[in-house]
Amino acid sequence: MTPPGRLYLLRVRSAPVLLLLGLLLGLPPGAQGFPGVGISPSAARTAYQHPQKHFIQGTLKPAAHLIGDPSIQNSLRWRANTDRAFLRHGFSLSNNSLLVPTSGLYFVYSQVVFSGEGCFPKATPTPLYLAHEVQLFSSQYPFHVPLLSAQKSVCPGPQGPWVRSVYQGAVFLLTQGDQLSTHTDGISHLLLSPSSVFFGAFAL
């Protein structure tokens, strides 16, 4: 049995047609057209003639992608609606936290990149610890609960410039009103650019 949410690529007269499993499952079981699939001839024609429209209509789910604000020092502040960052279909950003619009399964992800000129003092460098965490605050819990967490350390090590990246992502069952936020140690070493530091989630 194919897992829910998988994207199908069908070929009709050698033209690729994208159909979402969610659209197929939403049709009546007895619909005529493709046996065992449950899609009517009219729906199939729509998908064939207007695949982009058909695909977009089937993916109007909550999604958010945030990037770090490089204008703010000593703090990681998230921003949307700029440089490929966005909030769609119910997601909102409040007090540097993403507010979950509806209950369901979400893929939550984040990446940060740290960099430095070298280890100091050079004679006996002190270890530098870096960490990034995605946290959940919910009405079910009176405190922030870690969802994703990663740590790295640099120094002692090579005396030249260094770079460390951390990417995390996983699927979680979230509830409407949940708040997603991040906590970072080593903020002064963040390499703030839209492609290096980001945070987001989307419904499955």
UniProtKB/Swiss-Prot annotation:
GO MF annotations in UniProt: cytokine activity; tumor necrosis factor receptor binding
Signal peptide limits: 1-33
Keywords: Cytokine, Disulfide bond, Glycoprotein, Membrane, Secreted, Signal
InterPro entries per UniProt: TNF (IPR006053), TNF_beta (IPR002960), TNF_CS (IPR021184), TNF_dom (IPR006052), Tumour_necrosis_fac-like_dom (IPR008983)
Coiled coil: none
Residue pairs linked by disulfide bridges in the UniProt entry: C119-C155
Annotated compartments: Secreted; Membrane
Main location: secreted
Sugar-modified residues: N95
Listed GO CC annotations: extracellular space; membrane
An individual GO BP term: defense response to Gram-positive bacterium
Pfam family, one: TNF
Domain THD: 62-204
Superkingdom to which the source organism belongs: Eukaryota
Similarity-based family: Belongs to the tumor necrosis factor family.
Subunit structure as annotated in this protein's UniProt entry: Homotrimer, and heterotrimer of either two LTB and one LTA subunits or (less prevalent) two LTA and one LTB subunits. Interacts with TNFRSF14.
Entry function: Cytokine that in its homotrimeric form binds to TNFRSF1A/TNFR1, TNFRSF1B/TNFBR and TNFRSF14/HVEM. In its heterotrimeric form with LTB binds to TNFRSF3/LTBR. Lymphotoxin is produced by lymphocytes and is cytotoxic for a wide range of tumor cells in vitro and in vivo.
Protein name, as recorded: Lymphotoxin-alpha
Taxonomic lineage from the root: Eukaryota, Metazoa, Chordata, Craniata, Vertebrata
